[in-house]
Structures are given as C-alpha cells and as structure tokens.
C-alpha cells in the first residue's frame, strides 16, 4: 500500500461536501424562486433559515456539519501522510468514516430520521476518534 492511498477517502469526503453544497443551492434557489422572495427580504441574516422548511434548511445544516468533524479527519489524513504512517488499518477506518458520513448526509438531506442519523453520525465519528487515538498512541509511544 502506498502512502497516498489515504487520499481516496480524503477526496471522497471533499466530493461529498461538494455534492451537499450543490444540493443545498438547488433546494434554496428553488425555494426562493417559488416563494418569489426579494433581495430585501433575504438581506437580514437568518431570515432564510427562519422561513425555510426542513427540505431547504436540512441541506444547509448538513453542509455546516461537514465543516466540523470532517475537518479533524482532513487534519489526521494529512498528519498520517506527512509522517508516513498510512497503513491498511487507517485506510479502512477512513473509508468507514466516509461511508457513514455519506449515509448521514443522505438521511439528513432527505427524510431526516433523527435516530438513524444519530447512529450514522456516531459510527462515522467513532472512526475518526479511532484514527486520532491510534495516531496519538503511536506518536507518543515512540522514543525519539
């Protein structure tokens, strides 16, 4: 396995963020045009969020979520690559994160079953914490 193998799940997460961003704008623009909202009505911060139904606000909320735990994931991937620690365990854990994070986004942006979304988020986040804890143990367990 080459060190750059870790960038496949990295860029899969970037692509997921792009897809949610596009979907969010499709939902927002459709809502704004169907309601014939004016620029003046949208000028006050938070107005769109207050008047938007879940089908519009959920993709926006999910996009915000993609700049929380995934940022830690990106940092860990870069750390693993720079320190040449990428191995099968890390790559598999990274793919676990991507799969559960993608499912979480799909649920959040569509039917939004909260308990399902919670478990998908939990499993994705546990994969990131596993990567972080394992990397920290290896880092601090070495005698330099």
Can you say where each PLM-predicted feature lies in the sequence?
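Short membrane-interface loop/juxtamembrane segments of multi-pass integral membrane proteins
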Residues: 43-63
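Short juxtamembrane and helix-loop transition motifs at transmembrane-helix boundaries
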Residues: 52-59, 79-89, 140
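Juxtamembrane boundary at the C-terminal end of a transmembrane helix
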Residues: 131-144
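Structural signature of hydrophobic alpha-helical transmembrane segments
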Residues: 87-98
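Interfacial loop-to-transmembrane junctions
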Residues: 103-127
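N-terminal signal-anchor transmembrane alpha helix
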Residues: 4-42
């Amino acid at each position: 396995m080459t060190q750059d193998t870790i960038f496949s799940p990295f860029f899969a997460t970037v692509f997921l963020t792009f897809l949610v961003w596009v979907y969010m704008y499709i939902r927002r623009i459709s809502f704004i045009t169907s309601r014939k909202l004016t620029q003046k009505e949208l000028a006050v911060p938070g107005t769109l969020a207050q008047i938007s139904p879940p089908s519009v606000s959920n993709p926006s909320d999910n996009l915000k979520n993609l700049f929380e735990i995934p940022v830690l994931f990106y940092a860990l991937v870069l750390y693993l690559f720079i320190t040449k620690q990428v191995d099968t365990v890390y790559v598999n854990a990274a793919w676990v994160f991507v799969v559960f994070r993608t499912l979480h986004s799909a649920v959040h942006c569509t039917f939004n079953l909260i308990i399902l979304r919670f478990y998908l988020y939990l499993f994705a986040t546990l994969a990131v914490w596993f990567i972080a804890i394992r990397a920290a143990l290896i880092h601090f367990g070495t005698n330099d």
